[in-house]
Regions:
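Charged, well-structured alpha/beta interaction segments
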Residues: 3-36, 168, 174, 179, ...
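Flexible, solvent-exposed loop/hinge segments and secondary-structure transition points
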Residues: 5, 9, 22, 29-128, ...
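Alpha-helical support elements that line or immediately flank enzyme active sites
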Residues: 128-133, 167, 171
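Extracytoplasmic/periplasmic C-terminal soluble domains
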Residues: 142-187
C-alpha cells in the first residue's frame, strides 16, 4: 500500500471518529441534557438585570469585604508534607484572624481540589456574617435568615454538612442591601 493511500485511509478514519464522537454521541447527549436539566445544560448561568454575572457551578473570587468570600482558588497541588502548603495555610489563617475569625473553618484555609469550588460550608459562611453585617450595616439576624434560605446539601459523598453557593448568596445579599436601603426613611 502506498504512502498516499495510507494517508487517505488515516484521514478518513480520523473524520469518521470525529463524526462519531462529536456528532453521533455528543449532540444527542446535549439534547437529552437540555430536556432533563435545561439550566445545567446551559451552564447554570446566574443573571442580574438580564446580564450574566457568573456561573452557579464555578467559584469566583470576591475582593470586597462586603461579600461572602469563597474558598481559596488556584490549587497548588502541593503534598501535605510540603512546607510551602503549611506556610500558605498559616498565612491564610492569620489573614482571617486579622479579620476577626479566631479559628477559621478548614474550607476558608484550604484550596478545593478543583480550585473553582462554588460552595462554602455553613460554618465558614457563618463565621463571615459579623463582617458582612458591619460592612453592609445590616442586622446579623437578617443575614442568618438569608443564609438559611440559601442552604443546600449536603452535596455528594464527601460533604457531611450543608453548604451555601457563594455567588448565589452574594447576589441575594446585594438584593437585600438594596431593599434595606430603600426602606430607610429619608434624612
Amino acid at each position: 500500500m502506498s504512502f498516499t493511500a495510507q494517508l487517505l485511509r488515516g484521514v478518513r478514519l480520523t473524520l469518521l471518529l470525529w463524526l462519531l464522537t462529536v456528532v453521533v454521541i455528543t449532540l444527542p447527549l446535549l439534547g437529552v441534557a437540555r430536556l432533563v436539566a435545561p439550566e445545567a445544560a446551559a451552564g447554570s448561568l446566574l443573571r442580574r438585570d438580564g446580564a450574566v454575572v457568573g456561573a452557579r457551578l464555578i467559584g469566583q473570587p470576591f475582593g470586597s469585604a462586603r461579600y461572602l468570600q469563597g474558598r481559596p482558588a488556584g490549587a497548588p497541588n502541593l503534598a501535605a508534607s510540603n512546607p510551602e502548603l503549611s506556610q500558605r495555610v498559616a498565612a491564610a489563617a492569620k489573614g482571617w484572624q486579622r479579620g476577626g475569625i479566631s479559628q477559621p473553618a478548614p474550607d476558608l484555609l484550604q484550596d478545593s481540589a478543583s480550585g473553582v469550588d462554588p460552595h462554602l460550608s455553613l460554618t465558614a459562611a457563618r463565621q463571615q456574617l459579623p463582617r458582612l453585617a458591619r460592612e453592609r450595616q445590616l442586622p446579623l439576624e437578617e443575614l442568618e435568615r438569608l443564609l438559611r434560605q440559601h442552604r443546600e446539601g449536603p452535596l455528594g459523598l464527601q460533604a457531611i454538612e450543608p453548604v451555601v453557593n457563594v455567588l448565589g448568596f452574594n447576589l441575594a445579599l446585594d438584593a437585600l442591601s438594596v431593599r434595606a436601603a430603600s426602606s430607610q426613611p429619608a434624612p
